[in-house]
């Protein structure tokens, strides 16, 4: 990815993301982002819409599942990624080339909405500690202790498990 040009697109999803799985089991979500530029016409004192760009986009693996479970048709999103061209042959035998956005980062725009973010457990056991018998331990509490940005439950807010106060002195 070093040296590759990334672009950012802000627009609305035209449909719910389509989640599929490859034969090897990798998740992929495909969707279209519609982005319409708006300019202010001083003569008419009104906003004018430009031509809408419909950009196909794809996202892979765990992020694909997160996108499919979080974003829906009409959601205003901010997506950043790399443009990739792909050639294919239609059923009629015609050769086609399309340009798609290979998404690196995506999220809802908070300009006209609000969102609650729920952190997911990462696959590959990066955040999960195992007990002696090989079964997962209390991953949520372990991850919270290891993560300085984790939110304490209200009952524990302001104090550590060792009884010392975590509130700053000011």
Curated annotation (Swiss-Prot):
Give the CC-aspect GO terms: nucleoid
GO molecular function terms noted in the UniProt entry? single-stranded DNA binding
Q: Which Pfam families match?
A: SSB
Q: Where is this region: Disordered?
A: 113-170
The keyword Plastid appears for this protein: no
Record-linked InterPro entries: NA-bd_OB-fold (IPR012340), Primosome_PriB/ssb (IPR000424), ssDNA-bd (IPR011344)
Q: What is this protein called?
A: Single-stranded DNA-binding protein
This protein's species is Paenarthrobacter nicotinovorans
The organism's lineage?
Bacteria, Bacillati, Actinomycetota, Actinomycetes, Micrococcales
């Amino acid at each position: 990815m070093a040296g590759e040009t990334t672009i950012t697109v802000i627009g609305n999803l035209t449909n719910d993301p389509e989640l599929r799985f490859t034969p090897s089991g990798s998740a992929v979500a495909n969707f279209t982002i519609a982005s319409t530029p708006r300019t202010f016409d001083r003569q008419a004192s009104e906003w004018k819409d430009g031509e809408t760009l419909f950009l196909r986009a794809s996202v892979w693996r765990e992020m694909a599942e997160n996108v499919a479970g979080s974003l829906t048709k009409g959601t205003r999103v901010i997506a950043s990624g790399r443009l990739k061209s792909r050639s294919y042959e239609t059923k009629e035998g015609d050769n086609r080339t399309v340009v798609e956005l290979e998404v690196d980062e995506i999220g809802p725009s908070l300009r006209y909405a609000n969102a609650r973010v729920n952190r997911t457990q990462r696959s590959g056991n990066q955040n999960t500690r195992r007990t002696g018998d090989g079964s997962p331990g209390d991953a949520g509490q372990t991850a919270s202790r290891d993560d300085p940005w984790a939110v304490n439950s209200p009952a524990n807010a302001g104090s550590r498990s060792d009884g010392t106060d975590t509130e700053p002195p000011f």
